[in-house]
């Protein structure tokens, strides 16, 4: 893989990690487009590190607060919200890895993501702010995040949808969703590093790794800041239409043996 391909995959990872359209699903499509095999695992890991950097930079005040106040309500909310994904991830890791490699369900998963995004806008706008979020809210939002273990189910999409259903206001829904992404991304990085050290990754040039990581970080930061502002006044339906179109296209190509 050359640095330009890594740069493009970094753009895909950075934008789609925080837009509600599934980063894993788009990375699968990107690897297919560039004819990369699963040996791109090490690059995937570095791309996740890039998006993690984006979150750390955007939420630097929050993370400084969490370090100084490790037993704060915010920390407990993040822990409670992360539990469902940890349980599902540990119990079914191998099963979902096999699904991710084949891509056989990706088209359907994009359609499911679109359904939830479309239905979310039918809810009346909530008024809950960060201080109003309960542990029950965090657990339910985290349970929706656990569904994103399927490769083309959007993590940010599902958590934003769940947050809106729990009556968080639109800005807070996106804000908490991205903050909750941090432990999920860290967990994904840890699991991928385990596979890397077990020899499941190919050798990739340091230039490509650096370019891909910085690209993911830069575009991830843009996506976080843009999405929080966008959701204040705009609908999620445009993302629903996009993933529906993509899902239908993928299913059509799969059924005609083109993909």
UniProtKB/Swiss-Prot annotation:
Its EC number is 3.6.1.27. GO terms for cellular component: plasma membrane. This is Undecaprenyl-diphosphatase 4. Belongs to the UppP family. The chain crosses the membrane at residues 1-21, 39-59, 71-91, 99-119, 133-153, 174-194, 208-228, 239-259. Its main location: membrane. It comes from Bacillus cereus (strain ZK / E33L). It catalyses: di-trans,octa-cis-undecaprenyl diphosphate + H2O = di-trans,octa-cis-undecaprenyl phosphate + phosphate + H(+).
